[in-house]
Swiss-Prot record:
Classification via Pfam families: Anticodon_1, tRNA-synt_1, tRNA-synt_1_2, tRNA-synt_1g
HAMAP family found in the cross-reference section: Leu_tRNA_synth_B
Gene from which the chain derives: leuS
Superkingdom classification of source: Bacteria
Reaction(s) the record says it catalyses: tRNA(Leu) + L-leucine + ATP = L-leucyl-tRNA(Leu) + AMP + diphosphate
Keyword Glycosyltransferase among UniProt keywords: no
Protein name, entry field: Leucine--tRNA ligase
Keywords in alphabetical order: Aminoacyl-tRNA synthetase, ATP-binding, Cytoplasm, Ligase, Nucleotide-binding, Protein biosynthesis
Gene3D superfamilies for the chain: 2.20.28.290, HUPs (3.40.50.620), Isoleucyl-tRNA Synthetase, Domain 1 (1.10.730.10), Valyl/Leucyl/Isoleucyl-tRNA synthetase, editing domain (3.90.740.10)
Gene Ontology MF terms: aminoacyl-tRNA deacylase activity; ATP binding; leucine-tRNA ligase activity
Gene Ontology terms: cellular component: cytosol
Residue span of motif 'KMSKS' region: 638-642
Localization, UniProt: Cytoplasm
Amino acid sequence: MSTVEPNAYDPQQVETSAQQFWDATRAFQVDENSDKPKFYCLSMLPYPSGALHMGHVRNYTISDVVSRYKRMTGHNVLQPMGWDAFGLPAENAAIKNKTAPAKWTYANIEHMRAQLKSLGYAIDWSREFATCTPDYYVHEQRMFTRLMRKGLAYRRNAVVNWDPIDQTVLANEQVIDGRGWRSGALVEKREIPQWFLRITDYAQELLDGLDQLDGWPDSVKTMQRNWIGRSEGLEIQFDVRDTTGAALDPLRVFTTRPDTLMGVTFVSIAAEHPLAQHAAKSNPELASMLETLKHGGVSEAELETQEKRGMATGLTAVHPISGEEVPVWVANFVLMGYGTGAVMAVPGHDQRDFEFANKYGLPIVQVVKLREPRNDDEQAWDATQWRDWYTDKSRELELINSAEFDGLDYHGAFEALAERFERKGQGQRRINYRLRDWGVSRQRYWGCPIPVIYCAKCGAVPVPEDQLPVVLPENVEFAGTGSPIKTDPTWRQTTCPECGGPAERETDTFDTFMESSWYVARYTSPNARDMVDRRANYWMPADLYVGGIEHAILHLMYFRFYHKLMRDARLVDSDEPVTNLLTQGMVIAETFYRDADNGGKDWINPADVEIQRDERGRVVGASLIADGQPVHIGGTEKMSKSKNNGVDPQAMVAKYGADTVRLFSMFAAPPEQSLEWNEAGVDGMARFMRRLWVQVHKHVGEGAAALDVASLSAEQKAIRRKTHETIGKVDDDYGRRHSFNTAIAAVMELSNALAKFDDASAQGRAVRQEALEAMVLLLNPITPHASHALWQVLGRGETLLENVPFPQVDAAGAGA
């Protein structure tokens, strides 16, 4: 039985009592032996950085609200938690704190688990795991060896973003303005051996599958469609000659605009293209240029903004229609990793080619015109001024200056050229994708070892399954200059499993997106001997996944791909891992700073600032509490360490209680929108919690009575109608709309109406009892600790409220 004091609302006492009850009864531990419909709800698993931030709190509270609501509506609910524990931050912390990454990681997990428990989340902790343990990563090692045997995992040299400080490969998204996202070092291009998974084999299925994901935001699906980037075009062959006229290997280029072929005035190739390397052997100036371009970006986004640079190679390409020779140029906006590393340059109808041609004085030819120009600007064509219609394929176009193809539109030209090239063996129709195979190698220590052995005789050999896991040594001295396993001969040196000769282990580790690509399935059967067992097909696909939209094209793409690999390995039956996706907005807060001596800014935490606001709550002045002197107001931005505007959830829970923090995080904004942290708003939620506490205790002190609907007065009927209208709205807000802020507002309105209802008669008290019981249950998904206590105060006994049915609308009551 609860030991909560009857009158004063003490959040710490209330929350400790509820949490002890949940722990003692294993309230949220679930299994598959239920006749209830299943509901699998989870948030993206956290990285154990050392402390929760408000973004975590918002994310996990959303999941918890839905999970508790679903259990109250008769579902068998799984809400698990684990730790995405490998990764570069642990290595950096190990260097800074002079400790092993493993020790730092496990200590952080202990601390963050306690923080999560203090917030009262309805988590099945029996399924917890950390992805850095051999019990977890042995399964992805086994899967990788199977993918190797099927040809879905392979090794090749690849041009990568190389961070010379962190000594690792960076994804394109980790390169910001040409520098490493973490170290700030100038990124280089390097060609090194890398392991890849053939995600491109699944490109069309990944694209088609988006049409079935009705529960995913359109914005995420659009981002994935664009990232996959399906395009239909022609692959065309250009013969190549050197400076002596001798034939070299031909170039094959892919284009979605074959209608502009007669406008080709040069061909552009990537700096890493074999023809560029060949030409550089006899051209020192070109060789120097290629070396310079190593520091350029390798992402399309970077190439759109950086200055166009290039150099003629001295080679020429033969136009496949006219037979004319056009120069071959190296250009910094052509990527070796996209298509063939060569593009046909049509400066009259491609803006990048246009800018490049104007810079270097190359010919520009118009070969397409609009059939129905809308104005003089569209009638004119100027080789010195770019106009968007030059490349607008959506308009009615007509070929000009294109020999026998003059007068054709886009589709007519496409078909005519495709037929010609296929007949002559000079090209073919082709579907191309922007999506590249997933490079999974990382030159780091703190990651899952790639289970491969290199033998001089046998080559790359997968580690036999009976020798898995390949365990990463955890008790290491880590200085940050390279990886400890690379310099440890006892770990690195081994014998070849095929010939028994001397061999060496792969010292690269997996990209940490590998671990987060299948963990959702592992929660369903965390103690299975294989990757998953039959329980996966009970729970999968997950019903709701909550996380940030910033993961749309990396984690969520790999996540879908890996699930299909598991399906094809007959580990799961479903095609997709998640049915519904909720992408919550950021948590933002005000920023304050003083100018630093070095010309920068010293950011000051809002907790250290005295803020003056106008009558509308806007900041009009601010001063540092420590010295009373003014500070600059920096605007409202995402909570971050760099802006020092984060709020410590632990401090907020200690000051206000977990329920109040949960309540504010759900009330301040709809889930998909940014939430502005405002402690005045938190204080307002605390006042509401105290008012509700007093409201219930005052009512109980007056005594209860049985409800007799037939004898209710008009005022009593009005309160009862308000109660049942609120039940209907909150039920819809929780279940269909995920609009938690309006659900809270509706309960507050009912509370206010009840506060004005001072009928102390027996039926007045009965109507009030029904309303208060409904309010306690309606708030339970958001404020479960207080609801747990107030349910007892209302005389209903100590029980798990998630097993109490969610209130139902009484049609007669709603229309009373």
